[in-house]
Design a protein with these regions (language model features):
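Membrane-embedded alpha-helices and immediately adjacent juxtamembrane helical segments
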Residues: 1-286
Length: 286
């Protein structure tokens, strides 16, 4: 057993992975990234709240969808809030929410970039201005893609059903588009991951293929965890009948979830660094 273990850790890829993982400082960085993700939720919610009224979504249809996922006691509170949200837009609040979301998300990208740099063994960061501009650019691009993926996953099928009902059409095209919603969401998430691993680290990634292993690992791991999480929510959400208890549980679960996602993203960067180190002499470890 010891001989087998020694042979395993002496393999170049495994040896590189262990080296870069120890250098990544994932324990501390993942908590910092998760913290800024958590506080960025509130301005993002404000953005959604102030955009929805412009779509003129029928309140009754929206409430029917929400009612399917929430227990009755929670729904009574949420329904009142949703009714106000869908009828009272605020342009000033929307501008503030967008700026706040960009700031908090860019801060999380700063910490994630530091973790990626450590994973690649890069001690020197970009200059202050270029560092902030890169974080802002990546944050803005990721938020657009993430918002599109979230919109398709949450509202894609509902929007297609509304269009189908409005046109009163029985065309199989709508069923085909509904079947494409899931794969399209996964394709967008994979594009987000490739963009993240290619642009964020302060290291020259010479080939796109060097970031594909980590992106694929994160994609498959998140898909598995999301399926497990959805099963858990479907089985236990009805037991959370107290609104205050429900809110506190959601915050704790989201913080834990964000820490886990940050750790997985850092492991993805470590995998990419390990693969590239086998091909790039400048990343090769001793």
């Amino acid at each position: 057993m010891k001989k087998w273990w020694k042979e395993l850790i002496d393999r170049p890829l495994v040896k590189a992975f262990l080296h870069y993982y120890q250098a990544s400082d994932s324990e501390l960085t993942s908590v910092a990234v998760a913290y800024y993700w958590l506080i960025s939720i509130f301005p993002l919610l404000l953005v959604v709240v102030n955009i929805l009224p412009y779509f003129q979504i029928p309140v009754s249809n929206f409430l029917k969808v929400v009612n399917e996922f929430l227990p009755d006691t929670v729904y009574a509170v949420v329904a009142k809030i949703i009714t106000e949200v869908l009828t009272q837009p605020s342009t000033g609040l929307l501008s503030f929410a967008v700026l706040s979301a960009l700031w908090t998300f860019s801060k999380s990208m700063n910490f994630l970039q530091k973790a990626f740099n450590k994973a690649y063994g890069v001690a020197k960061n970009r200059g202050m201005i270029s560092h902030q501009l890169m974080s802002l650019f990546v944050s803005f691009g990721l938020q657009i893609l993430f918002a599109l993926a979230l919109f398709l996953s949450v509202f894609g099928r509902m929007l297609l059903n509304l269009i189908k009902g409005y046109w009163k059409s029985d065309s199989p095209l709508f069923d085909y588009l509904q079947d494409l919603t899931g794969p399209l969401v996964y394709a967008l998430i994979f594009a987000i991951l490739v963009m993240l691993y290619y642009f964020l680290p302060n290291v020259r990634v010479r080939r796109i293929r060097f970031v594909l292993p980590g992106s694929a690992f994160v994609m498959l791991t998140l898909a598995l965890l999301l399926n497990i999480f959805s099963v858990y929510v479907n089985n236990y959400v009805n037991h959370l009948v107290d609104v205050r208890f429900f809110s506190s549980v959601v915050v704790v679960v989201m913080m834990f979830w964000f820490i886990l996602i940050a750790k997985i993203l850092i492991v993805g960067a470590v995998i990419n660094a390990s693969v590239q180190s086998l091909k790039d002499k400048r990343l090769r470890i001793n």
